[in-house]
Structures are given as C-alpha cells and as structure tokens.
C-alpha cells in the first residue's frame, strides 16, 4: 500500500519535471506543493486522487499497521504529504505505530525512513505528539552513541545523505519540538 501511494505522489513530481523541461512553452500558475497536487489532479482527476488516498488510509487502519514495514509506513505518509493531503486518523495511527516500534526496539529504522516520516508530518502540519519526536531523538541518539559521545561513523551510517539530516532538523523546527 505504501508503494502504491508513493507511486502516485512520485508520478505527480515527475510530471512537474516534464513541465519544467518544456521551459518557456509552458506557463505554470502555481509551484511547489500546490503544483504537485494540481499536476496529480490533472493526470488522474481530483476526485480519484482524494478517493484513492482516503480509501488507502481506511484500509491501512483496518488492516493494522503492525503488518507494514518501516518503509511502507514512511512511504505512505510521504505520499500523502507530497500531495499536500492530511488524513489525521492515518497520521495518528502511523505516529503510534512508529513510536511503539522505536520505544520497544522492535525493528531498525533507516535514516531515510526516519527523516521522511518527520518531513511528512511537518509538511502537512500534522503536529505529532511530543512523545513521537522524543522517541525519534532517543532512537537516533541510541543508534549513534559511542563511548565518547556521538560517533560520526555511526551518524553517517544511519543518515547516508545530508538531506536526511536537514529534513530531520527542518521537521523538528516546523513542528516546534527541539530534541
């Protein structure tokens, strides 16, 4: 389900790249998140996109998020955020599931999954509970701590791209929680 939603959001982003490649032959009225949403609606129809994402959220919640991989959870909320859609119930359910996984040390998250999760919440102004940010910051600290504090090697093995760290910091700033 996460990959299906991801593909719809990615398609909208790629459509914008095509429009940008056409240069002066095309005039965009909007840019950024709104343009991605509009492109998606033009390609698939607004009712279809909204309907698909609402039904996907319902299915995810009824199926149970414990069955989803970390990447599925990350991809699902990323797709919603990329299109500028907020489904409060799904975001809250994902928040609770991720928090449970992080605090109970049930699974290892990759840096991209963590940063995309927080980026998604910040992008749609979902305002997660402070305990969600606390769980993320504790997990990152635990994964990166050495005997003498933070080891750069561990930090770079968790967050392989600078953009992931930037998204993490930006997400914390937007939701107003500073670990």
Which residues does each predicted region cover?
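Eukaryotic RNA-binding helical-repeat scaffolds
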Residues: 1-179
């Amino acid at each position: 389900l996460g990959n299906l939603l991801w593909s719809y959001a990615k398609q909208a982003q790629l459509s914008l790249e095509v429009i940008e490649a056409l240069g002066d032959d095309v005039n965009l009225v909007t840019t950024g998140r709104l343009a991605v949403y509009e492109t998606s609606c033009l390609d698939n129809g607004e009712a279809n996109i909204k309907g698909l994402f609402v039904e996907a959220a319902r299915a995810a919640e009824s199926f149970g998020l414990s069955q989803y991989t970390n990447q599925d959870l990350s991809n699902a909320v990323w797709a919603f955020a990329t299109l500028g859609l907020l489904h409060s119930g799904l975001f809250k359910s994902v928040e609770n599931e991720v928090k449970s996984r992080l605090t109970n040390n049930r699974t290892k998250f990759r840096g991209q999954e963590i940063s995309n999760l927080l980026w998604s919440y910040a992008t749609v102004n979902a305002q997660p509970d402070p305990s969600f940010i606390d769980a993320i910051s504790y997990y990152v600290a635990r994964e990166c701590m050495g005997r003498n504090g933070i080891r750069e090697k561990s930090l770079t093995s968790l967050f392989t791209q600078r953009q992931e760290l930037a998204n993490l910091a930006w997400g914390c700033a937007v939701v107003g929680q500073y670990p």
